[in-house]
């Protein structure tokens, strides 16, 4: 059984993919004592250009830090979907169904999740990245909810209890949705 998971989280700048990947790597390495690597790519503009975060989590040593054979590719924006759809082998492609219209002829498994809508229903569209983190955790079981929430609390330390609670709620909502997708 493969103990290493390779995940690409992609979209455009301003959607929080870098933070999402960072928190997954921290949850795995610091709070769950696994091995993890993180790399990011983004344009010089802070918003609107392609951006991605690559995370590898393993129970064993990781000898090459870049994602080469992804298990999961997350696309939060049409720009990212166009870049990866049909080009990722047998990896599962998880897309934000509020932003991306999937191409039905693209080979390989694809699943949509209404990430933007769920974030708006929580009252804060900026929680979409934490929702995505939860969905990834629920879908892949790469990190536990406990480890994820420790990373969330550490990152938002110094913010109000309301902000921390909102982000934990966003994680839980995404986690439940991800578990549901895993069971499909």
Q: Where are the model-predicted features located?
A:
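Active-site cofactor/cluster-binding pocket
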Residues: 1-184
């Amino acid at each position: 059984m493969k103990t290493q998971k390779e995940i690409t989280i992609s979209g455009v700048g301003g959607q929080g993919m870098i933070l999402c990947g960072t928190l997954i790597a921290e949850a795995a390495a610091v709070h769950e004592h696994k091995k993890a690597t993180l790399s990011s790519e983004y344009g010089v503009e802070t918003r609107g250009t392609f951006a991605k975060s690559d995370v590898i989590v393993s129970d064993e040593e990781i000898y090459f830090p870049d994602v080469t054979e992804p298990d999961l590719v997350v696309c939060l924006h049409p720009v990212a979907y166009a870049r990866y759809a049909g080009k990722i082998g047998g990896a599962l492609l998880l897309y934000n169904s509020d932003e991306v219209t999937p191409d039905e002829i693209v080979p390989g498994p694809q699943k949509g999740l209404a990430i933007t809508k769920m974030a708006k229903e929580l009252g804060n569209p900026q929680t979409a990245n934490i929702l995505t983190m939860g969905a990834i955790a629920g879908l892949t079981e790469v990190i536990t909810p406990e480890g994820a929430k420790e990373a969330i609390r550490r990152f938002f330390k110094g913010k109000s209890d309301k902000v921390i609670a909102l982000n934990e709620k966003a994680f839980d909502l995404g986690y439940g949705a991800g578990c549901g997708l895993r069971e499909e």
